[in-house]
């Protein structure tokens, strides 16, 4: 939905969220391809949903619930680095987002 205000076209938050999510999902696809990580259909669906939620939090400023860092001690440095690269693309999300996102990469790496 677009709204016109004094002649300027404004996108509503939902449209901005979708645009950001699609942009970042394109980056995720490229990143996965470069690292030869191939998620299965269910993993892809869950990853897509997570990235869309991240886009929502990025646009709305909605915070994550508190996350216990120790839950991610067994995540590989590679998966964490990939997740941090994606989180950096948003430009305004906390590092805890990378902790959560890294799980998707870690699980998908096991498909090889």
Short names for language-model regions:
Residues 1-112:
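A cross-family "folded-core" feature that marks the main globular domain of proteins
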């Amino acid at each position: 939905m677009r709204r016109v205000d004094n002649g300027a076209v404004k996108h509503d938050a939902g449209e901005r969220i979708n645009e950001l999510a699609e942009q970042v999902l394109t980056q995720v696809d490229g990143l996965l391809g470069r690292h030869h990580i191939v998620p299965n259909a269910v993993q892809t669906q869950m990853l897509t949903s997570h990235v869309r939620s991240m886009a929502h939090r990025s646009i709305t400023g909605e915070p994550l619930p508190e996350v216990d860092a120790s839950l991610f001690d067994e995540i590989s440095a590679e998966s964490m680095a990939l997740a941090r690269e994606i989180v950096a693309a948003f430009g305004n999300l906390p590092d805890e987002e990378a902790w959560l996102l890294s799980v998707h990469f870690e699980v998908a790496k096991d498909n090889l």
